């Protein structure tokens, strides 16, 4: 899969850590993904919504207005869905570029962001990809001390995916020592929050009355109930949970070693908690930029090349392991083997949709791709 190939290549660029290598590798990835789309499945739903976005009375399958109005502008301008997707991808990767160039370890930052986000956020869950793009721009403003700009950009991100509002917690994290008492309250709050979500998922009828959020929890809970998999069975048998737990333990050991810098603990803890249930996976991804920022500070004085420290190599190997997670999911793995380009014609697109439907229907009976259920 192309995503794993790029992750492995970026792994080695992070060892070398040269500005020119960062630019070359970034623009190669940018060019490839701006020319292609259709790696997963969600694009099928989005493509249908795109070509019906100007129809009177048409209601999209998502509630947030940001992406829908972008669709309207794109279709009104006469853009094909492929070209529209290319422009959206360009914006998302531009946010990654401007975020990374503000850091000391640019190659490491690009490698980390791509490994955590590539297949899901940057290609499959495109609305959340746009939300993350605005979050990256908001962090640039926050680091400049422009708190108003930070809040404004987070609110704009919420127009594309409501879950982005969780990024307002960055305001709380910024400039604090994560090992102090104040941050211990953050750990307690996150633990209680996740416990409430888990309780709601396994008792969905209790929260169904809550607008939007309750309905989503009810839907996720119904899927869990239909699958017949209990919480502990899922946690103890999940390779994904193990991978995130391993990385959390490693970062905790780094914190114990440094005695001071524990800034990566909270975002990594949230990433781990988010993997305990499907309902929180999307929320967890918003903490990846905070983790990347923290690890950039941790390795700011580290040597590169053949003198790269063991700690940095272990961290990078852990991130590389995270990038392999899509390979553990048959639906994602086989669904991302083929793709389209912005030059694909209608016949090629229809063939690809048919191919995707065969895969998703085989591996996921609870999928939400409407075209594949007709």
What is each residue range found by the language model?
Residues 1-9, 27-28, 87-91, 126-134, ...:
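Membrane-embedded alpha-helical segments of multi-pass membrane proteins
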Residues 118-119, 149-173, 267-275:
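Membrane-interface alpha helices of multi-pass inner-membrane proteins
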Residues 135-149:
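Membrane-interface transmembrane helices that cradle and orient dolichyl/undecaprenyl
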Residues 189-191, 304-324:
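Signature aromatic-anchored transmembrane alpha helix within multi-pass, membrane-resident enzymes
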């Amino acid at each position: 899969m192309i995503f794993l190939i790029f992750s492995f290549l970026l792994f080695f660029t992070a060892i070398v850590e040269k500005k020119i290598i960062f630019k070359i590798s970034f623009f190669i990835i940018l060019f490839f993904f701006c020319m292609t789309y259709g790696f997963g499945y969600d694009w099928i739903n989005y493509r249908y919504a795109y070509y019906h976005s100007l129809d009177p009375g048409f209601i999209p399958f998502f509630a947030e207005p940001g992406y829908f109005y972008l669709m309207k502008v794109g279709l009104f301008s006469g853009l094909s869905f492929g070209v529209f997707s290319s422009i959206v991808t360009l914006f998302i990767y531009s946010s990654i570029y401007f975020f990374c160039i503000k850091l000391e370890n640019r190659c490491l930052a690009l490698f980390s962001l791509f490994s955590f986000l590539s297949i899901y956020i940057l290609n499959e869950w495109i609305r959340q990809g746009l939300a993350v793009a605005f979050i990256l721009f908001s962090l640039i403003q926050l680091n400049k001390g422009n708190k108003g700009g930070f809040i404004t950009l987070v609110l704009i991100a919420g127009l594309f995916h409501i879950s982005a509002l969780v990024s307002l917690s960055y305001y709380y994290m910024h400039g604090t020592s994560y090992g102090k008492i104040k941050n211990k309250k953050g750990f307690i709050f996150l633990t209680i929050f996740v416990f409430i979500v888990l309780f709601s998922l396994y008792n969905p009828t209790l929260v169904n009355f809550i607008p939007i959020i309750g309905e989503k929890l009810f839907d996720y809970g119904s899927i869990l109930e239909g699958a017949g998999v209990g919480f502990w069975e899922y946690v103890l048998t999940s390779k994904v949970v193990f991978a995130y737990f391993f990385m959390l333990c490693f970062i905790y050991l780094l914190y114990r070693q440094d005695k001071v810098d524990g800034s990566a603990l909270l975002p990594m803890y949230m990433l781990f908690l988010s993997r305990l249930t499907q309902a929180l996976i999307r929320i967890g991804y918003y903490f990846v930029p905070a983790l990347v920022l923290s690890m950039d500070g941790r390795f700011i004085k580290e040597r590169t090349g053949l003198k790269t420290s063991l700690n940095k190599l272990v961290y990078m190997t852990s991130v590389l392991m995270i990038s392999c997670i899509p390979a553990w999911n048959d639906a994602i793995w086989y669904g991302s083997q083929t793709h389209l380009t912005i030059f694909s014609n209608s016949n090629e697109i229809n063939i690809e949709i048919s191919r995707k439907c065969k895969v998703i229907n085989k591996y996921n009976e609870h999928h939400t791709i409407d075209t594949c259920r007709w």
